[in-house]
């Protein structure tokens, strides 16, 4: 990834300062919002015990699932680099549109990579490769009662660099959504039902019985002919 140079957005500086502060700090997210102001309490970013996702090299990243998202509701993803807590990327969405991007100055992890799907549930995800630059903590954010809260926390690590916990195995690939898994299950069920239906249809035509009768008739004659030839 290229190093980005230029002026530093004031909002980004304020956000980074908030991360290092011990007192509660809030970021105003309401300037482009049609609803009431939603505030991000930065101290909450470290208040949830992390979960772990172990993965090999491949397509992976934080995937956030949301149900019953209204048009004016704010959701988002915050990324914290595994090797440096000060490297943070934050994207916020409202009504399928990016409303705020506190992008890291040197490494924009989520830029041109964060995507959104709304069928059947709202999903924020990216298809970036898992590299040393994209491993870290991903927090799924949602505005609740005027405060941006973490509803899910995900750690992504390279399986080749970190030992897996005993018996943990690899987690389900995060790019597999609920609707995609449902489609695969539905296709399997259709094939199974079709096979059963075809079997009973052939059974109704007495084709299996006729086939068995022909085999029973032919086999004794063939066996008798072989004995005669001997």
From Swiss-Prot:
Looking up InterPro entries in the UniProt record yields: HCMV_UL16_sf, UL16
Q: Which residues are glycosylated?
A: 35, 41, 68, 84, 95, 101, 132, 145
So what family is this one in?
A: Belongs to the HHV-5 UL16 protein family.
Query: Where, in residue ranges, is this chain on the Cytoplasmic side?
Result: 206-230
Any idea what this protein is called? Protein UL16
The chain's Extracellular topological domains, given as residue ranges, are 22-184
Q: Which Pfam families match?
A: UL16 (PF17622)
Q: What does this protein do?
A: Plays a role in the escape of host immune response. Blocks the interaction between the host KLRK1 receptor with their ligand ULBP1 and ULBP2. ULBPs activate multiple signaling pathways in primary NK cells, resulting in the production of cytokines and chemokines. Therefore, the sequestration of diverse KLRK1 ligands in the endoplasmic reticulum and cis-Golgi apparatus of cells by UL16 inhibits the activation of NK cells.
Q: Which keywords does the record carry?
A: Glycoprotein, Host membrane, Membrane, Signal, Transmembrane, Transmembrane helix
Q: Where are the transmembrane segments?
A: 185-205
GO cellular component terms?
Answer: host cell membrane; membrane
Q: How does it sit in the membrane?
A: Single-pass membrane protein
Localization per record: Host membrane
Cleaved signal peptide residues: 1-21
Q: Does the keyword Membrane apply?
A: yes
What's the source species for this entry? Human cytomegalovirus (strain Merlin) (HHV-5)
> What assembly does the database describe for this protein?
Interacts with host ULBP1, ULBP2 and MICB.
């Amino acid at each position: 990834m290229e190093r980005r140079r230029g002026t530093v957005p004031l909002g980004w500086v304020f956000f980074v300062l908030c991360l290092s502060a011990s007192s509660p700090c809030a970021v105003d997210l309401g300037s482009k919002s049609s609803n009431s102001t939603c505030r991000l309490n930065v101290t909450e970013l470290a208040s949830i015990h992390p979960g772990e996702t172990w993965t090999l090299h491949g397509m992976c990243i934080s995937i956030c699932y949301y149900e019953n998202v209204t048009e004016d509701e704010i959701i988002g993803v915050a990324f914290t680099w595994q090797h440096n807590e000060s490297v943070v990327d934050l994207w916020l969405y409202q009504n399928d549109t990016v409303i705020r991007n506190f992008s890291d100055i040197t490494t924009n992890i989520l830029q041109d990579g964060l995507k959104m799907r709304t069928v059947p549930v709202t999903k924020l995800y990216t298809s970036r490769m898992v590299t040393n630059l994209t491993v870290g903590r991903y927090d799924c954010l949602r505005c609740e009662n005027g405060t941006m809260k973490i509803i899910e926390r995900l750690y992504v690590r390279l399986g080749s660099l970190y030992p897996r916990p005993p018996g943990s195995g690899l987690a389900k690939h995060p790019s597999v959504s609920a609707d995609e898994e449902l489609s695969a299950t539905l296709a399997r069920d259709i094939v199974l039902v079709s096979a059963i239906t075809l079997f009973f249809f052939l059974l109704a035509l007495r084709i299996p019985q006729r086939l068995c009768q022909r085999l029973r008739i032919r086999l004794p004659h063939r066996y008798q002919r072989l004995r005669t030839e001997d």
